Swiss-Prot record:
This is Small ribosomal subunit protein uS10. It comes from Staphylococcus saprophyticus subsp. saprophyticus (strain ATCC 15305 / DSM 20229 / NCIMB 8711 / NCTC 7292 / S-41). Involved in the binding of tRNA to the ribosomes. Gene3D superfamilies: Ribosomal protein S10 domain. Belongs to the universal ribosomal protein uS10 family. GO terms for cellular component: ribonucleoprotein complex; ribosome.
Length: 102
């Protein structure tokens, strides 16, 4: 019989929020009796935007802004129905994007 697995990907701009959310998910899954692998830190996406500071000229004066997207991966192996119910009832911060694959 094939092992069932739930794969959870988390994305957030703040690494502290994503680590707290990952810790909550791991703790909830372990409490319900499932085996947990993770949280695994994935590469951070970094997008840089360059803007000219002046309105008309002075192209040499520029300002750079960056946006970092932190990602984590959690695998829950052999989840029980109790695990799925506990994960559905979990409240996580609004700054965390969650993608769940069964």
């Amino acid at each position: 019989m094939a092992k069932q697995k739930i794969r959870i990907r988390l994305k957030a701009y703040d690494h502290r929020v994503i680590d707290q959310s990952a810790e909550k998910i791991v703790e909830t899954a372990k409490r319900s009796g499932a085996d947990v692998s993770g949280p695994i830190p994935l590469p951070t996406e970094r997008s840089v935007y360059t803007v000219i500071r002046a309105v008309h000229k002075y192209k040499d004066s520029r300002e750079q802004f960056e946006q970092r997207t932190h990602k984590r991966l959690i695998d829950i192996v052999n989840p029980t129905p109790k695990t799925v119910d506990a994960l559905m009832g979990l409240n996580l911060p609004s700054g965390v994007d969650i993608e769940i694959k069964l």
